Amino acid sequence: MALPAVERREAWHWTLRLKSAPDQIIGSIDLRKKENDNRGFWLGLPWQRQGLMTEACQVVTDFWFDTLDFSVLRAPKAVANVASRRISEKQGMRLIATEDRDYVSGRFPSEIWEITAQEWRARKR
């Protein structure tokens, strides 16, 4: 499913690995050209709360705006996913909508967070 979207330049996927253990995948992050759903990620529990996903989000958000030249990034997240919300808040994103969404583990109340390229670049100055 991912490879055709990558070939069409509609999705971009990366794995997260520690420099000290480059053969071990500890997480994943992706970007996609979908309405209200441009970025998603997961990180294994042992590596959470260390700033690793915050760092990865910085890099891929730069890529979204500076390399791919999109004007807005929207990231959905389950309301219960407080850690994911904190990353969006740290990045200067704002909550723009709530809705129910389907996830691998079921349907849950969700939030959609947004930041524009202009806002992103202003934060980096």
Task: Give the ranges of each region predicted by the language model.
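Conserved acetyl-CoA-binding loop-helix of GNAT-fold acetyltransferases
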Residues: 43, 49-66, 82-90
